[in-house]
Amino acid sequence: DPLTLIDVDHVRFYVANAKQSAFFYAHAFGFQVEQIADLTTGSRDSAQYLLTQGNIRLLLETPLVPTHPSAEEVKLYGDGIKDIALTVFDAERAWEQAVRNGGQSAYEPRTISDATGSVTMAGIRTYGRVVHSFVSRRGAFDLPALKQGGLFSPGFRRVEGFALNAHNRQNPCGLKFVDHCVGNVELGKMNHWVKWYEDVLGFAMFKHFDDKDIATDYSALMSKVMASGNHLIKMPINEPAAGKRKSQIQEYLEWHNMTPGIQHLALRTDDELRSVAELRKRGVDFLAIPETYYESVWERVNGMLKRHGHEAVKEEHERVRDLGILVDADEEGYLLQLFTKPLQDRPTLFFEIICRRGSQSFGKGNFKALFQALEAEQERRGNM
């Protein structure tokens, strides 16, 4: 099947100033600033920085001229995610198949090559301004080589002497790979995009939550999680539900030029406590979880684990509370998670740091606490 998806190849951000964004993501989240394509490599209309950590690859792109497509998008949406790129065996065939399945082309297949190998990319549009690029890699640019520090594509060069890289190697944040990637769409549009992922990319529904699961007194949302066949690529889709006041999804849409987009990127760690402690030390701002959350969480979580024959949470309760981490369990095990505040001035994109101990769900038991924390922030911004 041409649409066999191997992995998340990279996540492309459009940003106003990639040099400064690269410094932020390196300093705050421990990414290595590895490669660059800019004026020095012959790229005349945009600059791109490749940041890596574990199997996570962020590509930060900024316009060098006002005619580059990223210039208009940064004006409309601020900094944010443009492209969740997917590694496939043959990008051209994957793109053809997706278009036959009803997908709309974002750009036609194009191949960049040199004597050592080639990279072919082709894109389709999903909700709002978001694109899925299909990426196939050959020779020196194949995925195993890339994971070992090989060049991203012809036209990139390695970054030498970026001082934070050594510091980040010695003080790792421990982020391993993209766990899932959440989109916000307009009211009434979630099922349309669920069907789109089924029809166009062959995804299947993995989980779903409705406003009974995710509601406070004020705001609610509905969410369905779409996953690729190998479950490596998960794309939850949120829509607002009717509440007394504006939901966080509605707030996102309003500050994202009334356009759907990527709300957050969840990054996986094997050690939530170590990762969060290191990120806090680096000055990352996380949502403040109400103290009352910890009064009932252990009973709820360990009770669920016991009922399904699992061991209790092994992380030290006090450390979990001190670091403000959320815990949830289901029949398969438990998870630990925490959400940053927005990563730019607009209340749009944020990150989630997640650790799974058996659980494959998304922290349903935390939705309420999370919403209360989000609403407190929303109120401070005057967006209720």
Q: Where do the model's predicted regions map?
A:
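Vicinal oxygen chelate
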Residues: 6-16, 49-50, 69-96, 122-125, ...
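N-terminal beta-strand motif that seeds the catalytic metal site of vicinal oxygen chelate
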Residues: 1-19, 81-84, 145-194, 258-268, ...
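ER-lumen resident redox/N-glycosylation machinery signature
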Residues: 36-37, 67-75, 135-136, 172, ...
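Active-site-adjacent "gating/activation" loops or surface patches in catalytic cores
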Residues: 159, 230-251
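Long compositionally biased, domain-poor regions of proteins
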Residues: 233-235, 255-343, 349-357
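Core segments of cupin and vicinal oxygen chelate
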Residues: 3-6, 12-57, 100-101, 109-115, ...
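Hydrophobic, ordered structural segments
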Residues: 69, 77-163, 170-172, 182-184, ...
